[in-house]
Design a protein with these regions (language model features):
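Alpha-helical scaffolding within the catalytic cores
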Residues: 1-2, 34-37, 61-74, 98-109, ...
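Serine-esterase "nucleophile elbow" of acetyl-processing enzymes
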Residues: 1-54, 67-76
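Conserved catalytic region of serine esterases and O-acyltransferases that act on ester linkages
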Residues: 182-200
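Active-site segments of SGNH/GDSL-like serine hydrolases
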Residues: 83-87, 102-139
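A conserved mid-domain beta-alpha-beta active-site/ligand-binding segment of alpha/beta enzyme cores
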Residues: 161-163, 168-170, 178-188
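Oxyanion-hole/transition-state-stabilizing segment in secreted/luminal serine hydrolases
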Residues: 13-15, 21, 61-98
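Solvent-exposed loop/turn segments at secondary-structure junctions
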Residues: 18-21, 56-61, 86-91, 117, ...
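Glycan-recognition surfaces in beta-rich domains, encompassing non-catalytic CBMs
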Residues: 172, 176, 197-200
């Protein structure tokens, strides 16, 4: 964030599945990814920002690792948000281990990229079941000292407490409506604002 505060030119990138792509949002500017990008623009008016969205529906971290360069890293991002916690479907311990390995390969590729991007892990959740690969993904994130956001521990928990209904959030139990995109963006922005405050 120091570079943004100095007014430098930065690229904000996103890599994930259909939620990152913007599934069910009424317009691009209503997606969580674009809302997070707009936070950077509004928080650092002196800087110039570029937006790259590498979200493709139905893709897991294995495919994400294969397409990371062409869909995101070739643009030399300075900040990257990674979201594959619901696309990495670990139905068995063996599958969980497999996706943890592919996720580690993806995260390693991003953090070691020459542009040295700051990385943030976003963990979405199946609202109808609570399933997510966040525990496995967060273990990888902790290894690389990458901060993470848990939607299961925030929005999903509030839903279970009765503050939201399942019908208010994803119409199919997973993919976000406009409200959920806004809420997810809010959780990411909350962490970004905490990081910004630590640096001041």
């Amino acid at each position: 964030m120091a570079r943004a505060a100095r007014g430098e030119e930065l690229t904000i990138g996103f890599l994930g599945g259909s939620i990152t792509q913007g599934s069910l949002a009424s317009a691009e500017d209503k997606t969580y990814a674009y809302r997070v990008y707009r936070w950077w623009c509004d928080a650092f008016l002196q800087a110039e920002f570029h937006y790259v969205n590498g979200g493709i529906g139905g893709t897991c971290s294995c495919f994400g690792a294969a397409r990371a360069v062409g869909d995101l890293l070739m643009y030399q991002p300075d900040v990257v948000v990674v979201d594959f916690s619901v696309n990495d479907k670990g139905e068995t311990p063996e599958e969980e281990s497999f996706y943890q390995e592919t996720y580690e390969g993806l995260l390693r590729r991003i953090v070691s990229w020459p542009s040295s991007p700051a990385v943030l892990v976003l963990n979405n959740v199946y609202y109808d079941s609570g399933k997510t690969m966040q525990d496995r993904h967060n273990a990888v994130a902790e290894h690389y000292r990458v901060p993470f956001v848990s939607i299961k521990d925030s929005i999903y928990r509030k839903m279970k407490e009765g503050r939201y209904s399942l019908e208010e959030l994803p119409p199919d139990g997973l993919h976000p409506n406009a409200l959920r995109h806004e809420l997810v963006a809010g959780e990411v922005i909350r962490l970004l604002e905490e990081i910004r405050a630590w640096g001041e």
